Swiss-Prot record:
PANTHER family: PEROXIDASE 25-RELATED
Cofactor(s) the protein requires to work: heme b; Ca(2+)
Cofactor comment text: Binds 1 heme b (iron(II)-protoporphyrin IX) group per subunit.
Entry-listed glycosylation sites: 83, 155, 169, 210, 240, 290
A GO molecular-function descriptor: lactoperoxidase activity
Additional comment: There are 73 peroxidase genes in A.thaliana.
Record-listed substrate binding positions: 164
Entry's induction text: By high salinity stress.
InterPro entries found in the cross-reference section: Haem_peroxidase, Haem_peroxidase_sf, Peroxidase_pln, Peroxidases_AS, Peroxidases_heam-ligand_BS, Secretory_peroxidase
Binding site for Ca(2+) 1: 70, 73, 75, 77, 79
Keywords assigned by UniProt, alphabetized: Calcium, Disulfide bond, Glycoprotein, Heme, Hydrogen peroxide, Iron, Metal-binding, Oxidoreductase, Peroxidase, Secreted, Signal
Protein name: Peroxidase 30
Length: 329
């Protein structure tokens, strides 16, 4: 009798495990996840991008940056979009204070809610808009499997601790990327998104005027480039508003020129310069520069798809928010 009871318990355990495994496999991200529940979802997003990105081409960079910042905090769950009246949400953290595109994503969400209420997650909207925005700038496309669910927790401190700041050295970059399951090649390739977009002198002034107690100017910065910035752009330590192109002369084209600038010590951020301080990442950069744009596009797309899978919530985990900015919607 005891043996039979033990056998029955063992069978129950095995069946429970198998059911759990089955549910887990069913809950994974998949291509065309909304094919039945909201068949036009991806077209609605793509059309909105195409209809608006040409009037505001500078929006492509913020949308891909938003995807990056979302995935690095609690996974790709749309929590970066949540508003907080107490100022404690992810978007209140220093790395996100200059983040743009919140209203753009909210408008797409409103369009989808009219057609398919409570169906398409904010997390999926971020992932799809990032891809479609890059394509609109002439960059690569990549597969975006969908089925992400939205998180309801958005924490300022977690964002501060997990999003790599522009002042990061190589050790910090490696650690923060590793925490998300991303390797050194991913680090270099995802940094390639700096080929589009702009920043401000606030992100550069310390490198130009107040780098350390012993050195005023960052020695890793090309001296001619620094002199040009001081003369024509960031004319004082207090200039926080002047716009700087991430990839001067090519900031609206998705290409390899960012890596060429990094090799010339003309990357805007300390984190850009940090990529050349490690032999492994330096080799990846040189291989990219000496290769074709097609090869770069393919590799970048692979890393973007990999990042888009970081710690996603699927199946019964998470929720589908009706308003991306409201945690309890």
């Amino acid at each position: 009798m005891k043996t039979m009871t033990q056998l029955n318990i063992a069978v129950v355990v095995v069946v429970t495990v198998l059911i759990g495994m089955l549910r887990s496999s069913e809950a994974q991200l998949q291509m065309n996840f909304y094919a039945k529940s909201c068949p036009n979802a991806e077209k609605i997003i793509s059309d909105h991008i195409q209809n608006h990105i040409h009037n505001g081409p500078s929006l492509a960079a913020p949308l891909i940056r938003m995807h990056f910042h979302d995935c690095f905090v609690r996974g790709c769950d749309g929590s970066v979009l949540i508003n907080s009246t107490s100022g404690n949400a992810e978007r209140d953290a220093p790395p996100n204070l200059t983040l743009r595109g919140f209203g753009f994503v909210e408008r797409i969400k409103a369009l989808l809610e009219k057609v398919c209420p409570k169906t398409v997650s904010c997390a999926d909207i971020i992932a799809l808009t990032a891809r479609d925005a890059v394509v609109a700038t002439g960059g690569p496309s990549w597969s975006v499997p969908t089925g992400r669910r939205d998180g309801r927790i958005s924490n300022k401190t977690e964002a501060t601790n997990n999003i790599p700041p522009p002042t990061s050295n190589f050790t910090t970059l490696q650690r923060l990327f590793k925490n998300q399951g991303l390797n050194l090649k991913d680090l270099v390739l995802l940094s390639g998104a700096h080929t589009i977009g702009v920043s401000h002198c606030s992100s550069m002034n310390t490198r130009l005027y107040n780098f350390s107690t012993t050195v005023k100017q960052d020695p890793s910065l090309d001296s001619q480039y620094a002199a040009n910035l001081k003369a024509n752009k960031c004319k004082s330590l207090n200039d926080n508003s002047t716009i700087l192109e991430m990839d001067p002369g090519s900031s609206r084209s998705f290409d390899l020129s960012y890596y060429r600038l990094v090799l010339k010590r003309r990357g805007l951020f300390q984190s850009d310069s940090a990529l050349t301080t490690n032999s492994a990442t330096l080799k990846v950069i040189n291989d990219l520069v000496n290769g074709s744009e097609k090869k770069f596009f393919k590799a970048f797309a692979k890393s973007m798809e990999k990042m888009g899978r970081v710690k996603v919530k699927t199946g019964s985990a998470g929720v589908i928010r009706t308003r991306c900015s409201v945690a309890g919607s």
